[in-house]
Amino acid sequence: MKIILFLTLIALASSELYHYQECVRGTTVLLKEPCPSGTYEGNSPFHPLADNKFALTCISTHFAFACADGTRHTYQLRARSVSPKLFTRQEEVHQELYSPLFLIVAALVFIILCFTIKRKTE
């Protein structure tokens, strides 16, 4: 228990926040700057934009922002060679024979037929 409290205290005292982002290699990633007067620490091309945003080219990179209050925001970009959603084939939507709607309609027709046949025999 003391070890957990000690580790929690160390984590709070370090005041370092981590941000992870996945992207497609070669595209541009738009991120929000964590603090307006932060210092950029990294070797990737950094393009500041309006509204406290910045753009980076997506490569596997590690960089950080050091804020004036002492908080350090560490970013990790993970570049993928292709997006998993780009080449997925859109399958046609087809109605199966035993879908719930079909079964409900079939049950209602069966019950109606049973009552009409029963009345005809009486």
From Swiss-Prot:
Q: Name one GO cellular component term.
A: host cell Golgi membrane
Additional record remark: Bat coronavirus 279/2005 is highly similar to SARS-CoV (SARS-like).
- Which stretches of this protein does UniProt put in the Virion surface compartment? 16-96
Q: Motif Di-lysine motif residues?
A: 118-122
Q: Which SUPFAM superfamilies match?
A: Accessory protein X4 (ORF8, ORF7a)
Q: How does it sit in the membrane?
A: Single-pass membrane protein; Single-pass type I membrane protein
Which organism does this record belong to? Bat coronavirus 279/2005 (BtCoV)
Q: What is this protein called?
A: Protein 7a
Q: Which domain of life is it from?
A: Viruses
* Residues in compartment: Intravirion: 118-122
Q: Which UniProt keywords apply?
A: Disulfide bond, G0/G1 host cell cycle checkpoint dysregulation by virus, Host endoplasmic reticulum, Host Golgi apparatus, Host membrane, Host-virus interaction, Membrane, Modulation of host cell cycle by virus, Signal, Transmembrane, Transmembrane helix, Virion
**Cysteines engaged in disulfide bonds, as pairs:** 23-58, 35-67
Instruction: Note what the entry says on domains.
Output: The di-lysine motif confers endoplasmic reticulum localization for type I membrane proteins.
Where does the UniProt entry say this protein principally localizes? virion
Q: Which Pfam families match?
A: bCoV_NS7A (PF08779)
**How does this chain assemble?**
Interacts with the spike glycoprotein, M protein, E protein and the accessory protein 3.
